[in-house]
């Protein structure tokens, strides 16, 4: 039977440890950690994600600051808000909820976030630190994936790992993080020739293509580990209902794989948990708190 990499279960276990960590250190710091989330416009999915982050913060004792801006706001006004939050001593972490309306220069806004508060790990300073394998904020989804693998003692070093997707949010930082852990990494994308043949070489296959049910059994070798980053809402046979699925056609591959992540309940919960970890990491550094935070992770 294939091993289910249960991100929801692991995230709750880590959240309990994070809650204890905050409780044990907030008297020394004289405040709890603070996370600022900037949302622009009315994208429905963004509303759900921001709500999930706010709830997660509440569960473990992080104070959240939600700034919901109208789409009519100007680029300069958002930049000024970010600069103001950079100097706010009650805020340890900050993120710009993506996607944002196309009229904004996304990367310029992110570049204004203080690297020590950049809990999404998207500021060019943190990306540069990742490339150089120096300590810094790491992107949440890649970090969540690595901790999922570690939680089940799945070895990265020396393994052939294929990453499908080259986004700045997942594919690129994940490939670098795996490379830094001595994985043998192949990054693929929509223009890769013979994609299924390349994927069949993988000991660990990570699907972040953004295409529902792309990966079937022809992409997967016997005994592989498969990580599904995709999440899509499709119409079910009952036209009034929808269902969630990933990039992987799970029912077609499950008999071949050693381990897999479900959708939902796999990578998604761990992404939010690593956001909490990054926020607490920034808080910890600011106050010189106990450096046992890494001991709370797999």
Swiss-Prot record:
NADP(+) binds at residues 165-167, 190, 231. InterPro entries: Aminoacid_DH-like_N_sf, NAD(P)-bd_dom_sf, THF_DH/CycHdrlase, THF_DH/CycHdrlase_cat_dom, THF_DH/CycHdrlase_CS, THF_DH/CycHdrlase_NAD-bd_dom. Its EC number is 1.5.1.5, 3.5.4.9. Gene3D superfamilies: Leucine Dehydrogenase, chain A, domain 1, NAD(P)-binding Rossmann-like Domain. The keyword Oxidoreductase applies. Pathway: One-carbon metabolism; tetrahydrofolate interconversion. Keywords: Amino-acid biosynthesis, Histidine biosynthesis, Hydrolase, Methionine biosynthesis, Multifunctional enzyme, NADP, One-carbon metabolism, Oxidoreductase, Purine biosynthesis. GO terms for biological process: L-histidine biosynthetic process; methionine biosynthetic process; purine nucleotide biosynthetic process; tetrahydrofolate interconversion. Pfam families: THF_DHG_CYH, THF_DHG_CYH_C. PROSITE patterns: THF_DHG_CYH_2 (PS00767). The keyword Acetylation does not apply. HAMAP family: THF_DHG_CYH (MF_01576). Belongs to the tetrahydrofolate dehydrogenase/cyclohydrolase family. This is Bifunctional protein FolD.
């Amino acid at each position: 039977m294939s091993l289910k990499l249960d991100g929801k279960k692991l995230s709750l276990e880590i959240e309990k440890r994070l809650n204890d960590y905050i409780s044990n250190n907030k008297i020394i710091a004289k405040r709890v950690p603070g996370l600022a989330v900037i949302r622009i416009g009315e994208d429905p999915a963004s509303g759900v994600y921001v709500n999930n982050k706010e709830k997660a913060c509440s569960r473990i004792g992080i104070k959240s600051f939600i700034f919901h801006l109208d789409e009519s706001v100007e680029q300069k006004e958002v930049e000024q808000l970010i600069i103001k939050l950079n100097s706010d001593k009650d805020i340890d972490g900050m993120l710009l909820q993506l996607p944002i309306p196309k009229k904004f220069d996304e990367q310029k806004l992110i570049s204004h976030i203080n690297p020590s508060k950049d809990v999404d790990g998207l500021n060019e300073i943190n990306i540069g630190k990742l490339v150089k394998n120096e300590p810094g904020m790491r992107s949440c989804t890649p970090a969540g994936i690595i901790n999922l693998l570690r939680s089940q003692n799945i070895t990265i070093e020396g393994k052939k790992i294929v990453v499908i997707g080259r986004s700045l949010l997942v594919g690129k930082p994940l490939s670098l993080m795996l490379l830094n852990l001595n994985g043998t990494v192949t990054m693929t994308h929509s223009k890769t020739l013979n994609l299924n043949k390349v994927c069949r070489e993988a000991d660990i296959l990570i699907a972040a293509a953004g295409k529902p049910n792309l990966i079937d059994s022809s992409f997967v070798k016997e005994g592989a580990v498969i990580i599904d980053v995709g999440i899509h809402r499709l119409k079910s046979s009952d036209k009034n209902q929808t269902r969630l699925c990933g990039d992987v056609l799970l029912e077609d591959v499950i008999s071949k794989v050693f381990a897999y992540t479900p959708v939902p309940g796999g990578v998604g919960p761990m992404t939010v948990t690593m956001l909490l970890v990054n926020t607490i990491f920034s808080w910890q550094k600011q106050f010189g708190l106990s450096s046992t935070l890494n001991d709370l992770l797999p």
